[in-house]
Curated annotation (Swiss-Prot):
Subcellular location: Nucleus, Nucleoplasm; Nucleus, Nucleolus; Cytoplasm
Motif (Nuclear localization signal 2): 91-95
Encoding gene, per UniProt annotation: jmjd6-a
Textual note on the cofactor: Binds 1 Fe(2+) ion per subunit.
Organism: Xenopus laevis (African clawed frog)
Major localization class: nucleus
Protein name (Swiss-Prot/TrEMBL): Bifunctional arginine demethylase and lysyl-hydroxylase JMJD6-A
Pfam families in the record: JmjC
Amino acid sequence: MNHKSKKRIKEAKRSARPELKDSQDWCRHNYCEVFSLNPSTVRDNVERADDAHLSIEEFIDRYEKPYKPVVIVNATADWPAQEKWTLERLKRKYRNQKFKCGEDNDGYSVKMKMKYYIDYMEGTRDDSPLYIFDSSYGEHPKRKKLLEDYEVPKYFRDDLFQFAGEKRRPPYRWFVMGPARSGTGIHIDPLGTSAWNSLVHGHKRWCLFPTNTPRELIKVTRDEGGNQQDEAITWFNVIYPRTQLPSWPPEFKPLEILQKPGETVFVPGGWWHVVLNLDTAIAVTQNFASCSNFPVVWHKTVRGRPKLSRKWYRILKQERPELAALADTVDLQEATGIASDSSSDSSSSSSSSSSESCSEDDLSSGAEMMSHRKKKRKICSVMENGDSTTQDDCVSKERSSSR
């Protein structure tokens, strides 16, 4: 590695993680040597469905409406990214393009040129390495060519936040790339949105928990995690072993996934999830608001992003009056039963617009879910402040990946 690469890497690390004072802090736990990344240790227990045999209607009925995670296979077989997203080709095509790999203490993006980041990836021994988690590539004249390398899987093409306007809508799509031990800390995606994550190269280890899982049960404390409290690898080192003990509440046992190349994970709104890269991983992920989850997303957007909701409503009334009418029926005083960080700015929907109208069944499903959650709320002990705009029940997708 040349001197300039070392300098740029050092600058990025200092900006993104100022609490880690030197190289010893970055490698203090020696996870590079002592933490097992063996895929065979993952207790993969989430249902898989084949894209070739799963219709959109079946997906909605079997997984989206009941808020059930699933892994979809073969949805990315025709993507050019399968050939184009190798380290060698990315380094050649985007070598001088800057990608976000963290945030500083003031919330500003920390970016690194692709050529320097790949140099870093290939040699790092850091406990929790910097991770490219870039949401702005689609608006950049050169980086937006990444959009040509994949298409949104057919199940996720509702893009209801498109009606909020490109400038006002929250970030919603991310190009993600990182080495072994990098990842995304435990969080819930904001504003009640659901998400999909398609892995092009590498392997990811997931744990998912239902929305009513008590925060204190699955969050690493400061005493336990120190400067690495919010890192995915810290979570798997501290919390995961507890989930396998007989004393762990059975109703909060995690769903586990070993995501392999070509697999797409569907994360319903409100589900806690944590993701660890087991090797060099390259993926794309998007949040989305659909006909099925619209009532919950609308509720949380009004509570957490009132200005956004007003503009969204005005355009929906013109373009999708049936959704505006549904929005009018949502009781904003009742909790949804779906936890999320309403104040987060990294939310939203898939990039591919859909001309299809929502069926009455789709429109009613989200409202039914809210009604069902209200009835179930006393049983599940959902956090009282689950819909507060000031609470911090989760961290945003971006911050949990870059901090």
